[in-house]
């Protein structure tokens, strides 16, 4: 496995290193993505593909009276996220679980927000996964997607060759899959300079 495969599923020492790199490397994208939504401080949040846990920290800062759950299918990511958010976990404000987005291990309609930062590239069967996100969201809940690659930059295709199972989607492809999964109001934001996209979908 080449080192960059750890972006899909961090494993071993290389995976630990990758989670730290993702925490710092994706910080600006995350900050921009959060600027496109308003957050209820009492919210229940699920961060799917939580990686190293930096976005859990960000959510906790916005949901002081709520609860944030991180989920990843990588054991390394779960462990690193738990380590970074140990205090919040002890306080009962946070938990981090191992799970697959194609079969999210939570009941229907339990979250106000679900976020996916730099992760939908690796989801198996996009529409099925979006159906699962829709299922666990409360009515009126928000699904936030943030990607550093908007599918229009040919230079980004090098990553799909380096990382097995990675697929870069355009905003039109993501919006079509969201509509198919039952999301209603869908807004798309773009940072054309950096080829970033953020999509905010309401159940």
Where are these regions (language model features)?
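A short acidic, Gly/Pro-enriched loop at the edge of an enzyme's catalytic core
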Residues: 102-113
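A short glycine-rich, Lys/Arg-flanked "PGG" loop and its adjoining helix->strand segment in the class I
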Residues: 127-139
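A short SAM/SAH-binding and catalytic strip from SAM-dependent methyltransferases
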Residues: 113-126
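C-terminal alpha-helical "lid/dimerization" subdomain adjacent to the S-adenosyl-L-methionine
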Residues: 2-5, 10-23, 27, 131, ...
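A generic alpha-to-beta junction signature in SAM-dependent methyltransferases
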Residues: 37-39, 62-63, 137
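Class I SAM-dependent methyltransferase SAM/SAH-binding core
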Residues: 44-103
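Conserved alpha-helix/loop element of class I SAM-dependent methyltransferases that forms part
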Residues: 24-43, 58
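Short glycine-dipeptide loop
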Residues: 42, 137-142
């Amino acid at each position: 496995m080449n080192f960059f495969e750890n972006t899909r599923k961090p494993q071993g020492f290389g995976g630990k290193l990758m989670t730290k790199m993702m925490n710092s490397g994706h910080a600006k994208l995350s900050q921009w993505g959060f600027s496109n939504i308003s957050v209820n401080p009492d919210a229940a949040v699920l961060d799917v593909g939580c990686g190293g846990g930096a976005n859990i920290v960000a959510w906790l800062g916005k949901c002081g009276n709520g609860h944030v759950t991180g989920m990843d299918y990588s054991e390394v990511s779960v462990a690193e996220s738990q380590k970074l958010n140990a205090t919040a976990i002890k306080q009962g404000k946070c938990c981090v679980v191992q799970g697959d987005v194609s079969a999210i291990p939570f009941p229907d309609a339990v979250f106000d927000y679900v976020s996916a930062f730099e992760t939908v590239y690796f989801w198996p069967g996009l529409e099925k996964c979006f159906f699962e996100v829709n299922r666990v969201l409360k009515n009126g809940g928000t699904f936030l997607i943030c990607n550093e690659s908007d599918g229009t930059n040919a230079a980004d295709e090098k990553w799909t060759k380096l990382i097995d199972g990675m697929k870069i989607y355009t905003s039109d492809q993501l919006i079509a899959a969201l509509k198919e999964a039952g999301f209603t109001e869908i807004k798309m934001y773009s940072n054309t300079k950096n080829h970033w996209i953020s999509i905010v979908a309401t159940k």
